[in-house]
Structure formats: C-alpha cells, structure tokens
Amino acid sequence: MDSKAIEIVRNYIVDHLDKSDKMPEFEVYVVWKCKALQNWKYLLSSTLLDGMYYEMTYNGDKKEWYLDAYKKFENRCIPD
C-alpha cells in the first residue's frame, strides 16, 4: 500500500510542476498512516520546498484511492 500511495502522489506532483522548468529531483515520503478495517489513510509530503502535503485515502470496499492536496501557509506556536 505504501508504494502505491507514494506513486500516486509522485505522479500528481509531476503532472502539476511548471512544464517550462527543468524536472527537479525529489522524493515523496509517508509522514503518517493508519488502517481502520479495510481502509487506509496516509499523510504524505515531498522534499520539494513548495509547502504542499497530501492526504491519501484507500477505500477497501470500493478498491479506490482518493487524493487531497493541501498547501501549508503557516506554522505558528500558540502558547497556553
């Protein structure tokens, strides 16, 4: 399952890169994953410095993958 999630995200990234730029070298990696019954949930990111992260969900009943792509705008510490 890991390799399929990584492959889907990698293909998504390549499809959305600026075609006028040289293809950068990058890796896609799993940040977090869990399995509930026949379903999988993944959070993934890449070594590109674009602030993107990806959520992959595998529906085991339907044998389908779902991809959500997010842009991180800010990371801030809020003290108690």
Question: What kind of region is each of these model predictions?
Answer:
Residues 13, 27-30, 71-74:
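Compositionally biased, low-structure terminal segments
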Residues 1-27:
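Short, non-transmembrane alpha-helical segments in secretory-pathway proteins
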Residues 27-64:
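Amphipathic, interaction-prone secondary-structure segments
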Residues 62-80:
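A short, surface-exposed interaction/processing loop segment used at functional sites
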Residues 21, 25, 60, 72-74:
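Generic preference for flexible, low-structure residues
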